[in-house]
Amino acid sequence: MSVTLDVRTPDGKTDGTVELPAEIFDVQANIALMHQVVVAQLAAGRQGTHATKTRGQVSGGGKKPYRQKGTGNARQGSIRAPQFTGGGTVHGPQPRDYSQRTPKKMKVAALRGALSDRVRAGQLHVVSHVVGGEQPSTKQARTAVRTWTEAKRVLVVLNKSEETSWLSLRNLQNVHLIDPSQLNTYDVLVNDDVVFTKAAFERFVAGPAKGKTAKAAATSGEAEEANQ
């Protein structure tokens, strides 16, 4: 069953309504699945270029520092052993690939669960536009955002073609801008409220709603994998 949401103007008035498709905005949120998808997304952003040198890679230390017996000291074979300052590192980090395989169906299910959670909490808004006219105005954008929500962190979903709104919003602190095609679970969850422009909302709904492989819930096998 679809839910309707008021479309608000920059001054807070109502300018019609939009229908929220149930298969996108009214599904059961799978916390374990959302966690897995977010962890995978953050892991994909890691460079994995960290590296340390072992005692065999550190320069120097090729000569035995002193003879084996007769000095009263513990025997040593190299000044580049781990116990020495400037020596090699034991079991230190080495370059690796942190990326995890995340099926597209799981990403879609996690995103829909996150959006549904925001709708149920009254933290998703649809607006007609951000600023009027063709001239960007950060002041107008700030006033409009505070009219729609008092949340500390706000995710605004708008098309890159909405250049005036994009330029007006991009300098606002704690306001994150994203194109509908790039909307993801992490950005929805890390921000308190989600604000769609009407044009971006229509584009987002038209996209995933057409895909036959885009499901509102993960399969039982995927859910079991997420819970492990």
From Swiss-Prot:
One Pfam entry name: Ribosomal_L4
Low complexity bias (residue ranges): 208-221
Domain of life: Bacteria
Keyword NADP belongs to the record: no
A molecular-function term among this protein's GO annotations: rRNA binding
Region (Disordered): 45-102, 208-228
Signal peptide, first to last residue: none
Its biological purpose: One of the primary rRNA binding proteins, this protein initially binds near the 5'-end of the 23S rRNA. It is important during the early stages of 50S assembly. It makes multiple contacts with different domains of the 23S rRNA in the assembled 50S subunit and ribosome.
Subunit structure, interactors included: Part of the 50S ribosomal subunit.
NCBIfam families in the cross-refs: rplD_bact (TIGR03953)
Family: Belongs to the universal ribosomal protein uL4 family.
Protein name: Large ribosomal subunit protein uL4
Source organism of this protein record: Saccharopolyspora erythraea (strain ATCC 11635 / DSM 40517 / JCM 4748 / NBRC 13426 / NCIMB 8594 / NRRL 2338)
Gene that specifies this protein: rplD
